[in-house]
């Protein structure tokens, strides 16, 4: 069974394209003047499930003194929800040049923090206090962003939540005299290309707006209220039963892919998660049964359909006893049900539940396991290599996953796992210090040991400021 499970996960990781983003496509031919896309991600802090900041503007600074604005409309972004994944924030035309830094104007931080000592877990919300509101932060790039005429460049920004929110020696959030959480944003920014491993959009989900099958494209209402055109081609992988010709609203769709020069996204993968308008998505905090013996899950709700928006940023307990459809994101093969079902929902997982919402009652019909990120430090001396990059290592995580496991988390890797800023599993085996690591993939129960383990498509050495 262990061998079968491992094979199924290798197949799953390959199909999801979370190994190294190898399903890249050539940019389209409809070039505009030089353009820049912006993606955001985060490095999570334990038990913080929501960390929103309003980005008032993002400005590129050219080495000759000129500037170019890539975001001018205030946009509220919850970086904690990204869970180590990359989401598109902006796309704009700029003057060709060599840009050496970016200035971010931030405002209105809000923090949602889970208290796992309560039963059920309780949610605390804090207003954050910046050094000044709004706060302006200029970040130098490790190397210049060179934007050529008719070219396309990317700006990757990462908010380090661990360092941005002040905590005491016990890990509790520090409040000022007004009861506000002290926030000093720590941002890492770098120039990237759409073809780079860290230039790929890995977390884009939204509602289907329209489909143009003749043009091999559709429009998605993505995060932050922006509509994005998604292009597909013969290399785009759809989940089973779906293609550009039978897409129709209502539908909630997941996409991974790369920006093109015209601002559209060339999709390497398209997943129709559900054709239902009602859904919730977030982190599992507790799994158990109610008084009737029905299986129920308690989760922090990060996203919902338009009809359930009042549930956002709340903790809800949902009866899932009648659910029979269990899926894994961007994975649709005969092994799916062997990997994820009602017996394998675990604390810390990121899941999506689709169903109906009538008279304020949510009736779930399907559950999908989503990709997620996990931050921690290497447990030195606990690295096993089976063959090449196939093996595992232990990661010390003081967040929800570490809480669920009750100690270091086993991270399984494969020869399709992409090691970013690392040479591979052999480097981890030779490390003598507890270096920080970010893993991205799936959190699942091992069917042999019964323990919760992480199955990584990406292992990265996070940027250090």
PLM region spans:
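Hydrophobic helical h-region of N-terminal Sec-dependent signal peptides
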Residues: 9-14
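Short helix-loop boundary/capping segments
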Residues: 387-391
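Bacterial N-terminal signal peptides that target proteins for export
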Residues: 1-8
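A short, solvent-exposed, low-complexity linear motif enriched for acidic/polar residues
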Residues: 21-308, 314-384, 399-403, 408-465
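C-terminal motif of bacterial Sec signal peptides marking the signal peptidase cleavage site
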Residues: 16-19
């Amino acid at each position: 069974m262990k061998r079968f499970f491992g094979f199924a996960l290798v197949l799953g990781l390959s199909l999801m394209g979370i190994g190294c983003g190898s399903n890249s496509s050539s940019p389209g031919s409809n070039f505009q003047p030089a353009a820049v896309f912006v993606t955001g991600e985060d490095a999570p802090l334990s038990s913080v499930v929501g960390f929103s900041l309003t980005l008032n503007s993002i400005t590129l600074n050219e080495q000759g003194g000129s500037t170019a604005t890539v975001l001018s409309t205030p946009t509220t972004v919850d970086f904690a929800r990204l869970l180590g994944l990359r989401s598109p924030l902006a796309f704009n035309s700029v003057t060709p040049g060599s840009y050496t830094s970016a200035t971010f104007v931030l405002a209105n931080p809000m923090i949602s923090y889970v208290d796992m000592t309560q039963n059920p877990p309780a949610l605390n919300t804090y207003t954050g206090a910046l050094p000044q509101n709004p706060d302006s932060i200029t970040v130098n790039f490790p190397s210049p962003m060179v934007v050529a005429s008719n070219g396309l460049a990317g700006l990757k920004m990462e908010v380090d939540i661990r360092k941005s929110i002040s905590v005491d020696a016990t890990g509790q959030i520090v409040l000022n005299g007004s009861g506000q959480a002290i926030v000093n944003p720590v941002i890492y920014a770098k120039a990237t290309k759409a073809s780079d491993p860290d230039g790929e959009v890995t977390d884009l989900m939204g509602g289907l707006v329209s489909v143009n099958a003749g043009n091999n494209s559709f429009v998605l209402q993505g995060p932050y209220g922006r509509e994005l055109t998604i292009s597909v081609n013969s290399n785009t992988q759809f989940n089973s039963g779906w293609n550009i010709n039978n897409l129709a609203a209502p539908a909630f769709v997941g996409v991974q892919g790369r920006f093109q020069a015209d601002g559209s996204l060339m999709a390497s993968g398209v997943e129709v998660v559900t054709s239902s308008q009602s859904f919730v998505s977030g982190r599992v905090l507790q799994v158990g049964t109610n008084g009737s013996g029905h299986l129920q899950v308690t989760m922090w709700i990060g996203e919902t359909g338009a009809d359930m928006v009042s549930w956002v940023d709340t903790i809800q307990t949902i009866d899932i006893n009648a659910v029979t459809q269990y899926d894994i994101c961007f994975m649709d093969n005969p092994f799916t049900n062997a990997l994820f079902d009602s017996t394998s929902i675990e604390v810390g997982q990121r899941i999506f539940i689709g169903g109906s919402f009538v008279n304020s009652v949510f009736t779930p019909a399907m559950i999908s396991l989503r990709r997620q990120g996990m931050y921690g430090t290497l447990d030195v001396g606990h690295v096993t290599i089976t063959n090449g990059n196939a093996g595992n290592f232990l990661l010390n995580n003081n967040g929800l996953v570490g809480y669920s496991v009750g100690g270091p988390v086993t991270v399984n890797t494969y020869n399709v796992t992409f090691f970013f800023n690392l040479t591979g599993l052999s480097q981890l085996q030779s490390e003598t210090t507890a270096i920080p690591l970010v893993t991205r993939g799936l959190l699942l129960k091992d069917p042999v040991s019964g323990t919760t383990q992480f199955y990584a498509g990406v292992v990265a050495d996070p940027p250090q400021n």
